[in-house]
Structures are given as C-alpha cells and as structure tokens.
Amino acid sequence: MSAKSKGNPSSSCPAEGPPAASKTKVKEQIKIIVEDLELVLGDLKDVAKELKEVVDQIDTLTSDLQLEDEMTDSSKTDTLNSSSSGTTASSLEKIKVQANAPLIKPPAHPSAILTVLRKPNPPPPPPRLTPVKCEDPKRVVPTANPVKTNGTLLRNGGLPGGPNKIPNGDICCIPNSNLDKAPVQLLMHRPEKDRCPQAGPRERVRFNEKVQYHGYCPDCDTRYNIKNREVHLHSEPVHPPGKIPHQGPPLPPTPHLPPFPLENGGMGISHSNSFPPIRPATVPPPTAPKPQKTILRKSTTTTV
C-alpha cells in the first residue's frame, strides 16, 4: 500500500507540471499577438489619417477646378450609393456647398479643345502637297538632261537643226530613233548626189580603202583602177622634166603621189576613185585624157 501511495503522488506531480508550463507559454503567445494587433491597429489609424488627407486634397483640387455640373437626384443617389465610406459623401457635400453657382463652362471647354485640335489638322495637308510639287521639278530635270545629251549627239552627228526639232517630252527614245534615221537618210542621199564626201572615211582607214570602195560601187573600180594606174605611170616620167605647162599647180605635190601607191597599196588610186564617178555617172563613155586631167588635180587636193 505504501508503495502505491508513494507512486500516486509521484505520478501526480509530473502531471501538474506540464499544464502549468503550457499555460504560461500560451499567455506569452497571447501577449505577443495582442501587441502585434495593437501595432496593426496603430498602422490602420495612420492609414485612415492619410486617406482623410488624400480626400481633403482631392476636394481642394476639385473645388479649384470646378468641374462639377448641376447634379440631379439620380446622380446624387448614384454617387452616394457608389461611395464606400461616409468621407466621400461628406467631401461631395463640401464641394457642392463651395460650388453653389452652377457652371456651364465645362461643356464649352471641350468644344474649344475640339476647335483647337481642328485648327492644327488643316495645316499639315499643305506640307503634304508641297513635297509633291517638289517632286515635279525633279522629274523635269532628268527630262532636260537627255535633251542636252541628244543635242550633243546631234552635233557630233552633224545635224545643226536637230536639237530644235526634238520635242521636250519625257520620252527619250523618240529623239534617239530620229537620230538613227536621220544620218541613214543623209548617207543614202549623199552617194546619189555627190560621192566626194566618201573620201573622209577613206582617209581615216587607209588599209581597207579598196574594200570599202568596192562596197559602194564595184563596177567603177574595175574601170578606173586600170586608167589611174596608167595615169600614174605616165605622170612619173612627165613631172620631173616639167613638160606639162597646163598643170602648173599640181607639179609640187605630184612627187608625193608615187610613194602612196607603193607603200599603202593604192592610196592615190583610192582618192582618185572617189572623185571620178561623178562624171561617169552623168557621161558613161568619157574619153581617156579627160578623166586623167581631173584625177590629177583632185588627187593633189586630197593629198594636201
């Protein structure tokens, strides 16, 4: 029994110890929570003060701007219902008291703003039109340049009245086509009227003169080559003694004639061939001495 009695109090002591410690811990935790709540409440009070200050500032700003119109009953009820606190309602009432006189100016201001916005809008279109006008002269400038180049081409081609005939259009291919046609027509008319200008290209190319001359009139070459050779053969012994009194001016240039046919293979013959076809075209059966005299004189002019 004694053992049991001893065991009971020993068992009761540890049972009483833990609940006392737990109570003290709970009390400490409650105190901490209360302190935290007090801090939160203090923060909430500060926030409420700040909100009131913000509302007062909003009221002062709205009262200075005077943006409110006459409020109808429905608008009043809507604003009151929409307000979440009494501070908003009080602020609205304060604003209404300050703005007793109804203001119809706000609707006038937006109209003025619209007019101000409409005025700057029309000026931008003129600058849009001006660049288009600036582009037009740019297009005119390149059209003027090809005309100048065509003028130079016409000058090189030998057409004095060509640039005046060219239109001032934008198409540049038309004057080029006219240029291609004009020299061809001139070349076609020249051999029909006078074959003298053919000596120009022959002077530039001295080695292919026979080939070019055969292309123009192959029939005349066979006739006059033999006659010209005979003329030059006769002229060699005749000129040194000076037996020919009628041909005074051709005597000094005649010594230059023999080296040309010897070196280039018929330079003097080619020049003489270019000029004589004028007479055979008009008079097919000319006598031998007549073309010889003309050949000598014209050959001297070409060599000079």
Swiss-Prot record:
Record field: transmembrane: none
Bias type Pro residues, positions: 120-129, 239-261, 277-289
UniProt region (Disordered), positions on chain: 1-27, 66-91, 114-160, 239-304
Biased composition (Polar residues): 1-13
Top-level division of the source organism's lineage: Eukaryota
Low complexity biased stretches: 77-91
Note: Was named 'Largen' because overexpression causes cells enlargement.
Function: Regulator of cell size that promotes cell size increase independently of mTOR and Hippo signaling pathways. Acts by stimulating the translation of specific mRNAs, including those encoding proteins affecting mitochondrial functions. Increases mitochondrial mass and respiration.
Name this polypeptide is given: Protein Largen
Lineage, top ranks: Eukaryota, Metazoa, Chordata, Craniata, Vertebrata
Encoding gene per record: PRR16
